[in-house]
Amino acid sequence: MRGCDSLLGIVRSILLCLHGDEPIAEGPIMADILFLEYPKCSTCKKARAWLEGKGIAFRTRHIVEDNPTAEELAAWHTASGLPVRRFFNTSGMLYRELDVKAKLDAGMTDAEAYELLATNGMLVKRPLLIIDGKPITPGFKEAAWSAALNL
């Protein structure tokens, strides 16, 4: 539990930096929330149930039928501050078939990564929660999602 408290403190610090002296509202945030999912994915099902259980209103987007564009991925990656490889579904068959790890290790640029990710939603780590255009850690991390949503 101590790690969760620490993570919550970090997220609150980031929010303070983003919002300056504006107070951070307590309780669930009211925002434009986009939930990118692959409906057959068990982690996506768990994340969806968690959001619904918390009473969070969100829009959904099928990550394969309407996969993210290179431009969206670039914006989300930049806003996240995470390494681009965190946006790849490293456990997926397509990731292994295309030997993406070797390409990343060989120095694939961020722009090349965005283009590759945009070719097929199955390459993208899911679920992906986007709040007001800014992503939360790719994949379902309850502590990070709770902190970002002020829960």
Residue ranges and their predicted role:
Residues 2-9:
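Extreme N-terminal basic, low-complexity initiation segments
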Residues 5, 18, 42-45:
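Secreted/luminal cysteine- and crosslink-motif detector
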Residues 12-29:
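Short, Lys/Arg-enriched N-terminal segments with co-localized hydrophobic residues
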Residues 31-49, 61:
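Local sequence-structure signature of Cys/Sec-based thiol-disulfide redox active-site neighborhoods
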Residues 45-48, 52, 96, 146:
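Class I S-adenosyl-L-methionine
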